[in-house]
Amino acid sequence: MCGCVHSTQDQALRLEGEPNPPAAPTSTLAPKNMPKSISISKQLASIKALRKGSDLEKAIATAALVFRNSSDPDGKLRKATAKNLLQTQFKNFAEGQETKARYKDLLSELDEHTENKLDFEDFMVLLLSVTIMSDLLQNIWSVKITQ
């Protein structure tokens, strides 16, 4: 896996190989000083390793960039921000879940999170949990995959 460094000259990302990638996403896809005004699609396009990346790789990279762009300088996401992201960036998956017990339990666990912040792993588990219980997932399963 590669880390990225922000180029102050042209506001682009360039990749540098790392023999031992960091365990925490401190330098995964976008550095802390990446201007928030740059769209996710432009940030993705600037990552050379993803130019020929698969749809799945780009999907995970997008989630990582959304997390990174929304996180505090310490690389953690406040729970209020996480809830806001569910409502604004993940609304089609979260829609209709508000009255379901599993969704309420998930948000309750988020409220009880002792640190009051989520790291990237916790954020991804949250997204996957909401996805699995989502009504939208049932629609996705019913999409024709052959002609």
From Swiss-Prot:
Region (Disordered): 14-34
Biased segments, Polar residues type: 25-34
Coiled coil keyword on record: no
Tree of life domain: Eukaryota
Compartment list: Cell projection, Cilium
Key words, A-Z: Cell projection, Cilium
GO molecular function, one term: calcium-dependent protein binding
Entry's Gene Ontology cellular component terms: cilium
CDD domains: S-100
Keyword Electron transport: no
Predominant localisation class: other
Extra facts: 'Sentan' means 'tip' in Japanese.
Function: May be a component of the linker structure that bridges the ciliary membrane and peripheral singlet microtubules.
Name of this protein: Sentan
Name of the gene encoding the protein in the UniProt record: SNTN
